[in-house]
């Protein structure tokens, strides 16, 4: 809606303003406590929605590379010691893992919404995996 210039209008009567109670007047006239400004806080959910939009726009990896690499090497130790990995192999593993997790969380969110909830729970992940046929 376009902004329009507002002109002063003559009062046409109406109700007269009531007198303020003593406590209300005292509250309004009291000075601000030491001029300390409260830190700004967004409403619950605002930051979460902003993060969702930010991460949906981006294409970079969400898991840090070195911790992921350590995890892969730790898991590989159980199968064979002294395994060596090309950096491109670890990169491909990380891409695949993140794509799988994002897809799983999308399905999990749909399960939570189907149950008329907005919070995902363990049972939503279990249901999503069961529907995919990953776990009987």
Swiss-Prot record:
It is found in: Nucleus; Chromosome. Its main location: nucleus. Residues 1-42 are annotated as: Disordered. The modification N6-methyllysine is found at residues 5, 10, 19, 24, 28, 37, 80. The lineage of its organism: Eukaryota, Fungi, Dikarya, Ascomycota, Saccharomycotina. CDD domains: HFD_H3 (cd22911). PANTHER family: HISTONE H3 (PTHR11426). The gene is HHT3. The nucleosome is a histone octamer containing two molecules each of H2A, H2B, H3 and H4 assembled in one H3-H4 heterotetramer and two H2A-H2B heterodimers. The octamer wraps approximately 147 bp of DNA. The modification N6,N6-dimethyllysine is found at residues 5, 15, 28, 37, 80. The modification N6-acetyllysine is found at residues 10, 15, 19, 24, 28, 37, 57, 65. One of its GO terms (molecular function) is DNA binding. Core component of nucleosome. Nucleosomes wrap and compact DNA into chromatin, limiting DNA accessibility to the cellular machineries which require DNA as a template. Histones thereby play a central role in transcription regulation, DNA repair, DNA replication and chromosomal stability. DNA accessibility is regulated via a complex set of post-translational modifications of histones, also called histone code, and nucleosome remodeling. Keywords: Acetylation, Chromosome, DNA-binding, Methylation, Nucleosome core, Nucleus, Phosphoprotein. The modification N6,N6,N6-trimethyllysine is found at residues 5, 28, 37, 80. GO terms for cellular component: nucleosome; nucleus. Pfam families: Histone. It comes from the Eukaryota. Phosphorylated to form H3S10ph. H3S10ph promotes subsequent H3K14ac formation and is required for transcriptional activation through TBP recruitment to the promoters. Mono-, di- and trimethylated by the COMPASS complex to form H3K4me1/2/3. H3K4me activates gene expression by regulating transcription elongation and plays a role in telomere length maintenance. H3K4me enrichment correlates with transcription levels, and occurs in a 5' to 3' gradient with H3K4me3 enrichment at the 5'-end of genes, shifting to H3K4me2 and then H3K4me1. Methylated by SET2 to form H3K36me. H3K36me represses gene expression. Methylated by DOT1 to form H3K79me. H3K79me is required for association of SIR proteins with telomeric regions and for telomeric silencing. The modification Phosphoserine is found at residue 11. The keyword DNA-binding applies. This is Histone H3.3. Belongs to the histone H3 family.
